[in-house]
Amino acid sequence: LVGSGLMDAGTANFFELLGASAPAPVEPPSVAALYVEADGVYANLPGVEVYDRQRDARRYRGPHPVVAHPPCSRWGRYAEYHPMVGDIGVLGDDDGCFAHALWAVRSFGGVLEHPKESQAWAWFGLMPPLTGGWQRADDFGGYTCCIEQCHYGHAARKPTWLYAAKVELPSLPWGRGKQRLHEGYLAKHGYEKARRAGIVAMAGGKDKVRIREATPEPLRDLLISIARTGAREEAA
């Protein structure tokens, strides 16, 4: 069957008679990427099924392990109020995205990513990671840790919490990454202002939000590799 990875000699000979090359086998999905952009870093990867906003990741019901990036705006420091804007929302009002992502990781295995200090951890009874390394997060077989995305190519340090279940837990680069400051802004305004401004805000310009929110490809590959160990455990 073409597209299933199961193509016998007769099928291959059929294409030869037509003077055409047989299409390459399509790798069946082994991981689902939830709450990601349709044209983002997870798009068109072999064995990865993308669930974006249009597809509504909340509808995912398995069976593959997941990499989940549920929206974080309603769980952060400014979930309800921003000093420059005023009232902006209600804490936890994310239309059930985090709850579904947590359920999917616990049910099918995989890993979930959220910013450090995400209030979703306390909301859902997860123990926050306090030191380097994986730690037990709950009574459902989940583990959590803190990493910094600068170790994987992000422009900023971007400390991040991970939650994983039913997968192998790799040793990762723990601890703080090297601080990066915009050299021109640092020279003009001094360390404290440059630190508060951040490298992404100064270097990113109009693209600063996109750059800040982007998942570096090395981190994407790491998260997929973690999730795939869940698929191996399921097959064992």
Predicted regions and their residues:
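Extreme N-terminal basic, low-complexity initiation segments
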Residues: V2-M7
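Class I S-adenosyl-L-methionine
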Residues: D8-G10, F14-A236
